[in-house]
Amino acid sequence: MHKQVEIFTDGSCLGNPGPGGYGAILRYQQHEKTLSEGFFMTTNNRMELLAAIVALEALKFPCKITLTTDSQYVRQGITKWIHSWKKRQWRKADKSPVLNVDLWKRLDKAIERHEIEWHWVKGHAGHDENERCDELAKAAAQSPTKEDTGYLESQQDKT
């Protein structure tokens, strides 16, 4: 039987694009772990995605997961849109390329071995764990330590 894990995630960006960070809480029985990291230049959607990715990648074994996010972009993307994107070689219905494809591919791989139920909560509405993740993400964004190479590469492609 797989371990039952709760994951809560949030991303933050001070400007969009701008310095950003993610925050995640992983809970298994009475154990809780927090994850956060800040990036010099990124977007809010990239941080929302990265929060879920890093949390899932932190799990050593296949788990049964309830993942709660305040990002419809992440929830809809992974539960609905990704199937069509993959069929169209990572293009949207209008033939334009999917944004953040590096992270969508990474998230797609991260979910493979888990059974995940995706939940959405309204951000800044008093959901305790979401508020804590928001605080972690904002603090990380205010003290960035890493480059978001995927974001930087996507910007170079535009020039």
From Swiss-Prot:
Binding-site positions, Mg(2+) 2: D10, D134
Gene Ontology molecular function: magnesium ion binding; nucleic acid binding; RNA-DNA hybrid ribonuclease activity
Keyword Cytoplasm included in the entry's annotation: yes
Highest taxon listed in the record's lineage: Bacteria
Residues bound to Mg(2+) 1: D10, E48, D70
Cofactor(s) required, per the database record: Mg(2+)
GO cellular component: cytoplasm
Keywords annotated in UniProt: Cytoplasm, Endonuclease, Hydrolase, Magnesium, Metal-binding, Nuclease
UniProt-listed Pfam families: RNase_H
Cofactor descriptive note: Binds 1 Mg(2+) ion per subunit. May bind a second metal ion at a regulatory site, or after substrate binding.
Single biological process term from Gene Ontology: DNA replication, removal of RNA primer
RNase H type-1 domain residues: 1-142
Catalytic activity, EC: 3.1.26.4
Compartments in which it is found: Cytoplasm
Family listed: Belongs to the RNase H family.
HAMAP family: RNase_H
Listed name of the protein: Ribonuclease H
Organism in which the protein naturally occurs: Proteus mirabilis (strain HI4320)
